[in-house]
Amino acid sequence: SCSLVGSEMCIRDRASILVYIKGKGVVLKEPSVVAFDRDTNKIKAIGEEARLMLGRTPGNIVAVRPLRQGVISDYTVTEKMMKYFIQKALGRKTFRRPRIAVCVPSGVTEVEKKAVEDATYQAGAREVSIIEEPIAAAIGAGIDISRPCGNMIVDIGGGTSDIAVISLGGTVVSASIKIAGDDFDEAIVRYMRKKHNLLIGERTAEDIKIKIGSAYKRPEPDYMEVRGRNLVTGLPKTIKVSSEETEEALKESTMQIVEAIHGVLEKTPPELAADIADRGIVLTGGGSLLRGLEELIAEHTGINTMTAEDPMTAVAIGTGKYVEFLGGYRE
């Protein structure tokens, strides 16, 4: 996501890019997808327009996500995409180059950070600062990170899930795993193929996840009609899918997140662990909207788990505040 304060802005990998302007809130939210023509290597579309092309493009047009799991997979395309979003958010009449803060997952290496920084300068930034995702998420979720007590934040994005224990404005213990929202979609695609011999696209899988996806048994199952291609006959087919099936499809991914939380709790100093048991675990990020995730984590850790008020924008807002109050938090 991407947050911006005055002409200060933060960009980060999510399945979407979010732009936050101080006083205006979120002004732009678009998927980090770029469609380009394979023959001419020219960019055809960026953002929402490109997402609509996912899985629907003629052979010569490819839709790609240049930022995968917080890491640049295609440098030139990332730079062009950032330039596009910066201009769209600020308007073309901007004379001053913005100060941009870039959010990265906690596990990103120095080399990867440098690549993100360089791409941001190339996209037109006057100044670039790099912030770790869990810190921004905690601030955005309304946690006062400057106090000497332990807070656990679990930020489930598109590409990565970041788990961190934060105290006194810094990360004490953290882990970043490459299991998140995109993996939920892929798990649903695999499940439909294996269980129903039905081939569905990424967008359909995302729809299933949003409408009936669940990580924990629901008192009453939800159902939805799903269309795809029957792998046996090769013809289109519609079937009814239940939320219980999504629970089964997502089990491996959700349990990996639970295990990563366990791992971080095991490494947490006892005083801070006691604070977390007291204060609970806070979930942020688009992936945290998966129904039943709070219950699943609470059941396996014995710690009360809640989702931040506006999990989708917590990191964007937190980054904005971080840039504003950098001095205050540092002190």
Sequence positions of predicted segments:
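Nucleotide/phosphate-binding catalytic cleft detector across ATP-hydrolyzing
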Residues: 1-2, 7-8, 12-156, 164-282, ...
